[in-house]
A protein has these predicted regions:
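Conserved Class I S-adenosyl-L-methionine-dependent methyltransferase catalytic core
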Residues: 1-34
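Conserved class I S-adenosyl-L-methionine
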Residues: 35-45
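Conserved SAM-binding loop of SAM-dependent methyltransferases across substrates and taxa
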Residues: 46-57
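A short beta-strand submotif of the Rossmann-like class I SAM-dependent methyltransferase core
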Residues: 128-131
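A short, conserved alpha-helix within the catalytic core of class I
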Residues: 134-147
Length: 211
């Protein structure tokens, strides 16, 4: 992908890789990735986190995102994992057919409107890295509602405090303060992990068990 990098002892080091290492360390510390079978990632972006997880763990992986990011991560993972069964299934609206395809594939790419078609509690782990704070609160609430039905545990990393400057211009509904429950985590989720990130230092990583 010709990302900017520096070379150290023959290894190409990029910001993308450094971020992925930090994310992987937190994810594995919370969820023990080797014990997870089915993983859902919300907002995978370029696919850097999914690449790191899939490099070291043989899991079934579903990415839920919107264009153009959906296609970027698709092309990246197709290139990195040529032997895996990977496909875009975002056009499938039949519940049975969608679940069958997900079961047949190693990596599936869907869009948010398909989450309610997936079998209840199918995912051992759901993650959302550096994306929840980019949504308005109505969208976050909808994702959390879907995750509530689909996953056993959920982890995400977000800004400790942020706002969406072009969503009603800094109104209360679009200001997120993690320590004031600004992300409105459902009451049936039990927090089991919380750590501040070393980089970026204004991020927090947390993990929840869904009861």
């Amino acid at each position: 992908y010709n990302d900017p990098y520096i070379e150290i002892n023959g290894a190409k080091i990029s910001l993308d890789k450094i971020n992925s290492i930090f994310d992987y360390e937190k994810l594995d510390k919370f969820a023990n990735l080797s014990k997870q079978n089915n993983i859902l990632e919300i907002g995978a972006g370029s696919g850097r986190t999914s690449q790191s997880i899939l490099t070291f763990n043989n899991v079934k992986y579903v990415i839920c995102d919107i264009p153009p990011a959906l296609y970027i991560s698709y092309e990246r993972l197709k290139k990195v994992f040529p032997d895996k069964k990977i496909d875009l299934v975002y056009m499938e609206q039949d519940k049975d057919k969608l679940n069958t395809k997900i079961n047949e594939l190693d990596i599936s790419f869907i869009m948010p409107d398909q989450l309610n078609l997936i079998r209840k509690n199918f995912f051992d782990l759901t993650l959302a890295i550096d994306c929840i704070h980019e949504m308005d609160k109505k969208t976050v609430k909808k994702f959390f509602s879907d995750i509530n039905q689909l996953s056993k545990i959920f982890c995400f990393s977000v800004w400790k405090k942020c706002s969406l400057p072009f969503s009603n211009i800094l109104t209360k509904d679009h200001v997120f303060d993690y320590y004031q429950n600004g992300y409105e985590v459902p009451s049936n989720w039990t927090k089991q992990f919380e750590e501040e990130l070393d980089f970026p230092s204004n991020f927090i990583f947390c993990g929840y068990k869904i009861e």
